[in-house]
Amino acid sequence: MSMEQDTRALLPTQGTAWATASAPVARLQGPQGDSHQACSQEPHSPSSAEAPYCDLPRCPPALQNPLRTTTCVGQSVHSLGLGLGQEPQRVWSPTTALPAEGPAAAPKNRHQDSEGIPYLEGLARSSCTDDNDNKDEDEDPNSNTSSSQDSNTPHDTSNSSSVDWDTTERPGVVPSRNRLTEMIPRRPQEGLRADSARKATRSPARGDTAGQRKENSGSGGQSAGQHWAKLRSESGYFSLERQRSGQTQASSGTPPSGPRGTTQASSAQRDVFQAAPAQEAPQTSSLPRNTQRDTQRSTPRTSSPSRVSQRDTPRVMSTQRKNTPLSSPLRATPETLKISAPEDGTHVTPSPCVQDSSLNRTSQRDSSRTPCIQWDNPRASSPNRTTQRDNPRTPCTQRDNPRASSPNRTTQRDNPRTPCTQRDNPRASSPNRTTQRDNPRTPCAQRDNPRAASPNRSTQRDSPRTPCAQRDNPRASSPNRTAQRDNPRTPCAQRDNPRTSCTSQNTPRTPSTQADKTTASCSKWEHLRSACTQRDNPRTFSQGCTQKDNPGPPSPRRATQGSNSRNPSPHRTNKDIPWASFPLRPTQSDSPRTSSPSRTKQNQVPWASISLRPTQGDKPQTSAPTRLAHNDPPQQYSPSLATTSSSSHNPGHSSASRTSSPLHAAPRGAPQTSLESSQPPCTVCIGHRDAPRASSPPRYFQYDPFPFFPDPRSSESESPHHEPPYMPPAVCIGHRDAPRATSPPRHTQFDPFPFLPDTSDADNESPQHDPPQFPPPVCIGYRDAPRASSPPRQFPEPSFFQDLPRASTESLVPSTDSMHEPPHIPTPVCIGHRDAPSFSSPPRQAPEPSLFFQDPPGTSMESLAPSIDSLHGCPLLPPQVCIGHRDAPRASSPPRHPPSDIGLLAPSPPPGSSGSRGSAPPGETRHNLEREEYTMLADLPPPRRLAQRGPEPQAQGSNEGRTRSPGRAEVERLFGQERRKSEAPGAFQTRDEGRSQRPSQAQSQLRRQSSPAPSRQVTKPSAKQAEPTRQSRTGPPHPKSPDKRPEGDRQLQRTSPPARTPARPPERKAQIERHLESGHTGPRQSLGGWQSQERLSGPQSPNRHPEKSWGSQKEGPSLGGWPELEGPSLEGIWRGPPQEHREQWGHSEAWEEPPSNGIQGAPPRGQGRLQELSRPHQPTPSSENSWAGPAECSCALQPEASTAVGWRAEGTSPHQRSAERPPDLDWRDLLGLLRAPEDGAWTRLPRLDWEGLLELLQARLPQKDPARHWHDPAKASGPEQGSSGTEDTLKTEPQTQPEGRAKATLANGHRPGQQSESPAQLPSPACTSTQWPTTKVTSGPETSPLAALEQIDHLESHSPPDLEFQPEEPEASEPSRGEDSRAVQKQADSADKRPAEGKAGSPLKGRLVTSWRMPGDRPALFNPYLLSLGVLRWQRPDLLNFKKGWMSILDEPGEWKKHWFVLTDSSLKYYRDSTAEEADELDGEIDLRSCTDVTEYAVQRNYGFQIHTKDAVYTLSAMTSGIRRNWIEALRKTVRPTSAPDVTKLSDCNKENTLHGYGTQKSSLKIGEQRTGSEVIGRGGPRKADGPRPSLDYVELSPLAPSSPQRMRTLSRSTPERPTKQEDLERDLAQRSEERRKWFESTDGRTPETPSGDGSRRGLGAPLTDDQQSRLSEEIEKKWQELEKLPLRENKRVPLTALLNQAHNDRRGPTSDSHEALEKEVQSLRAQLEAWRLRGEAPQNAPRLQEDSHIPPGYISQEACERSLAEMESSHQQVMEQLQRHHERELQRLQQEKEWLLAEETAATASAIEAMKKAYQEELSRELSKTRSLQQGPESLRKQHQLDMEALKQELQVLSERYSQKCLEIGALTRQAEEREHTLRRCQQEGQELLRHNQELHSHLSEEIDRLRSFIASQGTGNSCGRSNERSSCELEVLLRVKENELQYLKKEVQCLRDELQVIQKDKRFTGKYQDVYVELNHIKTRSEREIEQLKEHLRLAMAALQEKEAVRNSLAE
């Protein structure tokens, strides 16, 4: 022992030479027992260190040179002992330290010691395994050699040089070469598995048919050694030995009687020592060799990567075991002992523990299950471990079942390899597990622990054990296998040896193998002994194995033994070797082992299909058969163990091993692989990424002491770890991960025989990739896998989701859940692709239902639950989910999803939306999926064209938006028209006025046409576009059939009235129809949306006609009309939108009820409609919707209704709005805006802040009460009104008007009837509007529907004249609304964008809810209503304001940096590029809220401009002046939002004001325009004077009311644009009046009818007759004439006043918000008063309205004029006063600034003067000092000069010395160069001579060949004969080679037999000694008993004598 220890001590340092030198001695001794002792005892010290490699002793004999068979064995053992002794120490350290020294030293030692030790280890296993194998092979020389070779190979393989060794040594060992070759095949990863298999298969093939039969029968994995073990077990000897072994191992020191018992004891002890080096101390005498062997094995292990892995793993294992021990103190202690005293401490410290462990081992081994249980108990800390451990052998299946029973176990188990993730997780779960797992090499023990720690470990361990169990089962099937099972480790060893056996181990170290041959003999003998011991102690091993697996932790030895036995044992070695083995295997494949090699290939394939390993890991454990397969190829055991051990040993190979074991399982149980692959894949799936992360375990590999080995193994280890993640087919996740998982291929890469591993690698990788297929669920994880954290990601796209999206890499559980749910949700997951990450905004979620219907709406990537909810919530929304693909990421910013997208998406997305947001960054996989989705979306061109409005197909819009930029789509959608406006402000203004409106409508229609469905609508409108639109409004649009007319009308309205709406709604419709076509929510949405819209307009129109129409529509629209639209549509719409909005708004609670219907059913319909109307809006959610939808809808509806349904259009609009819940607020806003004009709310709106808004609402409500139920509620409801209020009002008014009853409508807009009717609809609005004061609006009974209609018309600014005006107002008002709505939409969009960007809880929620903010607030989400009211100051930028493009920005250093700029409502953001924008990777942003001005600025390059903010000035440059101009305009608009006006034309003052007053100004302007329109119409109709005027009175803009609305609009717009330019105003007025004329001409036909209730109804309900139209035209012409007389002057005044007011307000806004607030309060109060006054006058108003109808159509009533003039005057005075005050304040401020600047300048000048003084003084002092120094005289200068001279001289001297040195150096170098030249010449000459010699030889060879040919030719009778002769000669050569191979094989077998004989002899000697000692002890015992009896007799006699004496004394005393 000491000598061997010393030797070993030397080995580490001396390296291979010493190991080799000592190896012969050790080997000679070893086989004899010294080496065995060395192995046994030395492991004591190294044992701890080598505990991990304790298994190595199993293969100890085959140490360095398999060729040195005889010497090798002894030497191997000795070397192992020595090598191990020291190597273990060193190696142990190397294990820890090997990376540094290990690679070099370890490789040597590995080759030598490793060869010996791995060989020993291989022998231990190889002896066991190979002995089994060889016994199967009948002592197949290769078997032993294989063991040795395998052992060596593993080391070599591990070293990768092992391959070389194998290759190099192989030639050396020709006999072993077969095996080596065979082993080479094994050497590949599969070598491990294949080794077992091959050994099983090959053993018989190679060695014996009997062996083969045995292997095939069940000892296939047993090898010859196993066979022997079986035979012994059959003979009972093995069983006895086994028990002895168990005892021996258990008692370490007590060799079981019987040579084999001894051998087994030794082997077992070896293993025990390996497992428990400490034990080996007790065993020292008997186990020294074992210890040494163990140590050597351990050292070889250390030497071999497997061992390194093992060792590392042992360390790690120890560590892990420590970790495991953490689980179980026992384990900890043993492991700690192992670890703590790896070499000395191990055998010293562990010795007691080990002995205890030994005892425990005995118990544990005998109780191996108990140890298992102990392990399990240690594992008990980890139930999986315990269970699996407890189940280890027995519940191989149970373990498998445990795995099955416990998903983790199953997963871990199935995933043990497969779920590296779980493993990783287990590892993660238990660092031990992780570490252990990470130390897969160690993992036999570690893995045992890891398994103990983690089910995987348990699994692996259990797997090994289970393989033991299975092997046991296999063995159970065949006693031999049982023996082997007992030998499972033996089989493990055998398996390991089989691998080792697989000549690959031995062969890889062929030289070693030859040495190992001898050593192999010894080692194999040792191994045989080990095998025998294991075999004999199969239970000991088995138990030991189990204990190793189980006890391993309890007893370090066992753990080490188990782990080492497995891992260190050839198994590990095999794994190590398998790498090396693979090369050998080919030979084996040549040999009978060919079958094994085949398996190897299978293994390789499995290896290739690493995923199989998980399966196999699972299956091996799970299915005994698999294990049998594994067993059969003991490597199965290995596979498990191999996977475990190999994994443990060779992280890489281990991976391979794990993989390999699965692979083996795959090879053997390929089906299992597939099955398990299938199973694990899912599980693993998740882990893939996790697995790779799990790969962290590889880190332990990373720290592998033997990096070179770890490279194969480390890689393998990593691979195993990766592999576990990798192994799982789940690699899917791993696709990315898979490549990582592919790490196992790394081991393959390391594979000495890459060609072999390549197959494995290819297979492995392929399987890995395939496994990824398995974890399709993981697909989620592709990108999501990492992000899997949020299931939503899980489904990037259903299509992408080959894998279940749920298989989130995130977590198995989530993944599992995901997997379970994903099937349904997967589609939804689509949302999550990108959405999942950014899912924050639902809108993206459902860019377009039809597009994404594939995905369940709920499948938000965000979370399954949300997704599910979404799914449940809105099945139709699933498509929305898809939205998330791209949308998800962008979801962060709804803008990307066109607002419509948001709107659409919002409904469904909200639930998942948050989830989406939560789910993950758009990132990774999502992108791809999103892109696909995008492609789908992008395929929808209409959205782009319709993007403006078209976003209705948000999916498309979003797609495009997304594809392009969600923002862009949204902007186009929102601002498409506005952009056109901004681009052509005049045109827009004209359009707003109505002049351009038609074109815009036409454009909208065209756009709509561009969208499929819209085209039909558009076709009508476009066909009729201008006129038909008007007509449709007045006449055709009013066909009484609500459906027909509404449809046509709506189409027209949408097309013409809501240019935007048409544009969008058509698109929406198109998209919706598309959706319908898609069959998603399309039908409902399309039908619901379209019909609902159309019906809304239709019913609205009809409502106008038949009040019942309203009633029906009211209830019908909500229930009936909407049902027509799609019965549920209304409710659906209402609920749906509300739902959507709830989701959007986050008011799902409010929308709770509707959500289910709304979201599920309603959104489809409602969404359809909402999508049509609301979609654009929804995207903006409410804002855009409300504007686009409500504004447009109401505009659209109003235009339709304008004829007869003016109010209805609006009312319907509200319905629609309500229906389009998103628009609810928006609709309310629209209603507010639309109605405001009627109520004057519009007028008021512009300036009203919250108070104004509330007052407005109140005012509206009152007003509504007077004549317009809905109007008031709309106003009262405010936003609510918009949707619910409006709906109520609509419904109420229709009812009230038709029925002439005044119903109280709640501010919610829910009237009792309506609420019941559209409770869902209204509730949504109500919910939404609940934020607004819910004021009951009791609509005063409108006696006549006409009056009501008229009033409503007034309210809607569509009075009967409104019909006229409506055409105008719908166009004008609509344009204004359009602008408003657009502005609002923009705001909404911006808000949407913001919310999306801000990822407000719910984009819609944020949008809608956030919309309601205090005036100062800049809502992240814009509420168009608030914006219109002026509550929200910030309005959406025009299209120009929404801008993207490349520009350069001047950074601080003064460098130009090019960025992708994106202009949003509140900031200018810049990104690296558009992709970064998609990913939301912001480089910076410029806050435009503090922007004061945007000016051109000359820069050196391109065209520059500056953005001035309060904080800084930003300089940017555009490529062209046009781009710069566009940017400046957009920025100015953003800074000073104006509806249509070109901001660039605004005066600075206006610009400043614009920002402030934009919302109010724009709103007021629009309101004014609408109101003006209504008044203008009102002039024609009775309500114009009364209805509109009061409204006008309310509004500051009221002055505008007197002037023609269009002109006023023009003026107001012009004013904002260029309020100071009278000429422009006049020009605009002229244009607008002209346009109005056109409008009126088109609507003239309606005007005549409007005056009378009938007429208005008729206009609303039915198309006008030609006569009527002509009359209307005439009247309108007259009105225009009068209008142009009156209004122009008034307009001039009004606009100025209004402009001044607004400008003033704007100015005041910035300068004095308080004044503005006060003024707004006053106005609101005035509005209230006016409202009450109107109510009071309501009864009179009706008649008056009729009377007013008599007023010439072109004229404005005197009252209205006077009122407007008075208002104008008062407002003008106020404005002038304000201007004066402002001027004074400015003067004061300027004066203060002047003074401050002067003071500052003075201070600066003073400080500068002081600084100059100081500088002058300093300079003066310097000069003075110089002068003084000069005055001192030349003396100082001389001194200084001398000093300088001296310094220079010194320096010169130093330089001269250096020069001399350099000269000498140069001379020396010159001489050297000459010498080299001479040498070179000489070498050249020699080369030439050699070349000549070579040529001569070549010529001789040619002559010989010629002679041979002639000889052959002469022998051949003919060509054919010659050919046959040639063939025969070739055949003879082949036969010769075959015979040589057979000879080598036989030599190997002989060597193995010699080794076995030596082992047996040693066992015999030990047995004899043991018997002698036993007899002696018996004699002593008998003698002692006799003496005791005698002493007792003496004592009894003495006591009797004393008693007698006492009695006598007493008697005497008496």
From Swiss-Prot:
Positions bearing Phosphoserine: S1598, S1604
InterPro entries xref list: Actin_Cytoskeleton_Reg, M-RIP_PH, PH-like_dom_sf, PH_domain
MF annotations from Gene Ontology: actin filament binding; ubiquitin protein ligase binding
One GO CC term on file: stereocilium
Protein name as annotated: TRIO and F-actin-binding protein
Domain PH, residue spans: 1440-1536
One of the protein's GO biological processes: cell division
SMART domains the record matches: PH
Gene deletion effect: Deletion of isoform 4 and isoform 5 results in an absence of stereocilia rootlets and mice are profoundly deaf. Stereocilia lacking rootlets initially have a normal appearance and are capable of mecha-notransduction but are fragile. Shortly after the onset of hearing at P16, these floppy stereocilia lacking rootlets fuse together and rapidly degenerate, followed by the death of hair cells.
Domain of life assignment: Eukaryota
Gene name linked to the record: Triobp
Sections of the chain in a coiled coil: 1711-2010
Biased amino acid composition, Acidic residues: 130-141
Biased amino acid composition, Pro residues: 769-778
Keywords for the protein's UniProt record, in alphabetical order: Actin-binding, Cell cycle, Cell division, Cell projection, Coiled coil, Cytoplasm, Cytoskeleton, Methylation, Mitosis, Nucleus, Phosphoprotein, Ubl conjugation
Compositional bias per record (Polar residues), positions renumbered to this chain: 32-48, 155-165, 245-269, 281-290, 316-327, 348-362, 394-410, 418-434, 499-522, 531-549, 558-571, 601-625, 671-681, 808-817, 1018-1034, 1088-1103, 1280-1298, 1313-1342, 1601-1614
Modified residues (Phosphothreonine): T1879
Function: May regulate actin cytoskeletal organization, cell spreading and cell contraction by directly binding and stabilizing filamentous F-actin. The localized formation of TRIOBP and TRIO complexes coordinates the amount of F-actin present in stress fibers. May also serve as a linker protein to recruit proteins required for F-actin formation and turnover.
Subunit field text: Binds to TRIO and F-actin. May also interact with myosin II. Interacts with HECTD3. Interacts with PJVK. Isoform 4 forms homodimers. Isoform 4 interacts with ANKRD24; recruiting TRIOBP isoform 4 to stereocilia rootlets.
Compositionally biased residues, Low complexity: 142-154, 297-308, 585-600, 638-657, 697-706, 890-906, 913-923, 997-1017
Disordered as annotated region, ranges: 1-67, 84-1225, 1263-1343, 1357-1404, 1539-1671
Post-translational modification note: Ubiquitinated by HECTD3, leading to its degradation by the proteasome.
Residues with the Omega-N-methylarginine modification: R1579
Biased composition (Basic and acidic residues): 184-198, 713-724, 924-934, 961-983, 1040-1052, 1065-1078, 1138-1150, 1263-1274, 1374-1397, 1615-1647
Domain-level remarks: Contains at least 2 actin-binding sites per coiled-coil dimer.
Origin organism lineage: Eukaryota, Metazoa, Chordata, Craniata, Vertebrata
